[in-house]
Amino acid sequence: MKFNATLRSVQGTSASRRLRRAGRVPAIVYGGTAAPLNIELDHNEIFHALRKEQFHASILTMALEGGANEQVLLRSVQWHPFKQQVLHVDFQRVDANQALHTKVPLHFVNAETSPAVKLSGAIISHVVTEVEVTCLPQSLPQFIEVDLGNLLGGGSIHQKDIVLPKGVTFTHPNDEQVIVSAVVKGGAADDAEEAPAA
């Protein structure tokens, strides 16, 4: 994805307030061998971009007005506590030859055809919806697919069951980390609670 940016010459709290009143968002680009770069963004453009999952989990192209394009990764977003307003954005430069660590969303497929749902009427509980991975920029997936097609009622899928794309590893490997569980409605515990006291 691509977004537009302009160099920000004036800094400080009051300058940032003026920018926001003018429909702009202060931001910074850091990392790599170059000095940090203070930029400003169009609020509406960045607001709508942030609503797309792809903007959070892919290498972005920053088109700097009057300068060269740069490859960056979204690192953090500061939102207004109660308004739909972006206050500040942090980006990190991307080096094609240097591994990066970032979070990638999980996409769950085939839940409706799994034995857990079809045969047991289970409720699928998504315990984890994103994972942190390590890879070179060119190997960064926009998402990682988790196939629930063989999930049984009362069963679960762990981190070790996830098939990662080539060149991608978990930043914090934990084979027993539960990703998804299939919770069967009712069950012995509920039956015991509903039974009248002797």
UniProtKB/Swiss-Prot annotation:
Molecular-function GO terms, alphabetical: 5S rRNA binding; structural constituent of ribosome
Superkingdom as given in the UniProt entry: Bacteria
InterPro entries: Rbsml_bL25/Gln-tRNA_synth_N (IPR020056), Ribosomal_bL25/Gln-tRNA_synth (IPR011035), Ribosomal_bL25_b-dom (IPR020057), Ribosomal_bL25_C (IPR037121), Ribosomal_bL25_long (IPR001021), Ribosomal_bL25_short (IPR020055), Ribosomal_L25_dom (IPR029751), Ribosomal_uL5_bac-type (IPR020930)
Keyword annotations from UniProtKB, A to Z: Ribonucleoprotein, Ribosomal protein, RNA-binding, rRNA-binding
GO cellular component: cytosolic large ribosomal subunit
SS bond partners: none
Residue stretches spanning the membrane: none
GO terms (BP aspect): translation
Gene3D superfamilies registered for this protein in UniProt: Ribosomal protein L25, beta domain (2.170.120.20), Ribosomal Protein L25, Chain P (2.40.240.10)
Recorded family membership: Belongs to the bacterial ribosomal protein bL25 family. CTC subfamily.
Subunit annotation: Part of the 50S ribosomal subunit; part of the 5S rRNA/L5/L18/L25 subcomplex. Contacts the 5S rRNA. Binds to the 5S rRNA independently of L5 and L18.
PANTHER family tied to this protein: RIBOSOMAL PROTEIN L25/GLN-TRNA SYNTHETASE, ANTI-CODON-BINDING DOMAIN-CONTAINING PROTEIN, RIBOSOMAL PROTEIN L25_GLN-TRNA SYNTHETASE, ANTI-CODON-BINDING DOMAIN-CONTAINING PROTEIN
Role summary: This is one of the proteins that binds to the 5S RNA in the ribosome where it forms part of the central protuberance.
The name this protein goes by in its record: Large ribosomal subunit protein bL25
Native source species: Bordetella avium (strain 197N)
Lineage, broadest ranks: Bacteria, Pseudomonadati, Pseudomonadota, Betaproteobacteria, Burkholderiales
Name of the coding gene: rplY
